[in-house]
Regions:
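Catalytic phosphate/metal-binding cores of nucleic-acid and nucleotide-processing enzymes, i.e., regions
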Residues: 1-194
Length: 194
C-alpha cells in the first residue's frame, strides 16, 4: 500500500497534467510509476534508450506532442521554508532543482511545479528562459520562483514556444532565436535567417 505522501504526490502530478491539458488542448499525463526512471542513478539508461522513450520518462509529466522539450518535476509537501528564499539556502529546494536538472538535456525547458498545504501553488523556472513575465517572483540561485496561476496566465504561450523548439546556440554568424532582439518584425526575421 502506498504511503500518504506518495498518494499526495501522485494526485498533484495528475492535477498538473490535467491543468496543462486544459491550457494547451493536448494530452499531458503523469509518468506511470514516476520516480527517476532516467534520472539519479538511472541516468545511464539514456545511453541506450530511444529518444522517444527518454522524453516519455523524463520528469513527472509526459508533455503533449507539440512540446517535446518540456521537463516538469512536481512536488507536493506539507510545508516549505519560504523565509529561507531571502536569507539563505533552502536545501529541500536545492534537492528538487537537482532532480529536475539530473534528467534534463541541454535544450529542455525545465520546470519545478510545487504545492504546499494551505500556502498555495508555485512554479520555478531557470533564469535562462528570459522571455517570461512575472507579476511577483523571487530569484533563487538562477531559478525564478513565482505563483502558479499567475505564471500560467502570463506565460502559457511562451512556455509552449520555448518547449517546442530545440534552442540554437549563439555563434558569430547567427543570432539565436531564443536571444531577445529589438527592432521591427522584419529586422527580427532577417537576424534569424542570416
Amino acid at each position: 500500500m502506498p504511503s500518504k505522501q506518495k498518494i499526495k504526490g501522485a494526485t498533484w502530478e495528475r492535477d498538473v497534467a490535467k491543468h496543462l491539458t486544459e491550457i494547451y488542448g493536448e494530452t499531458f499525463i503523469r509518468v506511470p510509476h514516476s520516480g527517476a526512471y532516467i534520472g539519479g542513478s538511472n541516468k545511464v539508461r539514456k545511453q541506450y534508450l530511444h529518444e522517444g522513450v527518454i522524453r516519455t520518462f523524463k520528469g513527472d509529466i509526459i508533455p503533449g506532442p507539440s512540446m517535446p522539450y518540456l521537463n516538469v518535476e512536481c512536488k507536493a509537501y506539507k510545508d516549505f521554508p519560504f523565509h529561507h528564499l531571502l536569507t539563505g539556502d533552502v536545501k529541500l529546494l536545492d534537492e528538487w532543482i537537482n532532480q529536475v536538472l539530473d534528467s534534463a538535456d541541454e535544450h529542455d525547458f525545465n520546470m519545478l511545479i510545487m504545492k504546499f498545504n494551505r500556502k498555495g501553488k508555485y512554479v520555478a523556472i531557470e533564469d535562462k528562459h528570459l522571455h517570461h513575465k512575472f507579476k511577483r517572483h523571487i530569484n533563487y540561485k538562477g531559478w525564478n520562483f513565482s505563483e502558479y496561476d499567475q505564471f500560467w496566465k502570463l506565460n502559457s504561450k511562451t512556455v509552449r514556444l520555448q518547449s517546442a523548439i530545440k534552442k540554437r546556440q549563439i555563434n558569430y554568424n547567427m543570432k539565436s532565436i531564443t536571444q531577445p532582439t529589438f527592432g521591427s518584425r522584419r529586422q527580427v526575421e532577417t537576424n534569424i535567417a542570416t
